[in-house]
Amino acid sequence: MSDNTLYLRREKRFLVLLGIICLALIGGALYMQIVLGEAPCPLCILQRYALLFIAIFAFIGAAMSGRRGVTVCETLVTLSALGGIAAAGRHVWILAHPSDSCGIDVLQPIVDGLPLATLFPTGFQVSGFCTTPYPPVLGLSLAQWALAAFVLTAVLVPACIIRNRRKPY
């Protein structure tokens, strides 16, 4: 087996793991919403969409046979993570400055108008406010944890691409 094939297999395993982690995070968010009664705000829902897009693109990338297709999917994963950084970063800002609003009047109809909100309203429909403080998990708010996950994804996926695409001389 060539080095390129080994690197590609490693990237595909990483993408599968990333997709599983994103689905687990969405499952955790649904658990907190349904069982613990923590209502999601518009920014929470946008973060769920970002996680879902990361998972979808990661699984598609893992199923690709060529290096170019995997790279395209990894680029889409990174772009989805950047979208998640924007939503989670804004959410962290709002939690730090409670006088600001997440714009529920502006964002709610937009987020509730997205297709998944009608197909799966329990998981993708807005029912809360961004300024609602929930108990921290290991000292960080859920928005801070989401921001950390999106930043890690946005850094590690391109790092994986760069490391595996370098040609040893």
Swiss-Prot record:
Q: Does the keyword Cell inner membrane belong to this entry?
A: yes
Which Pfam families does its entry note? DsbB
Tell me where it resides: Cell inner membrane
- Which GO CC terms are listed, alphabetically? plasma membrane
Predominant location of this chain? membrane
Write out the GO biological process terms: protein folding
Q: Which GO terms describe its molecular function?
A: electron transfer activity; protein-disulfide reductase activity
PANTHER family assigned to the protein according to its UniProt record, in alphabetical order: DISULFIDE BOND FORMATION PROTEIN B
The record's HAMAP family line, in alphabetical order, gives: DsbB
Question: What is this protein called in UniProt?
Answer: Disulfide bond formation protein B 1
At the highest ranks, the source species' classification is: Bacteria, Pseudomonadati, Pseudomonadota, Gammaproteobacteria, Pseudomonadales
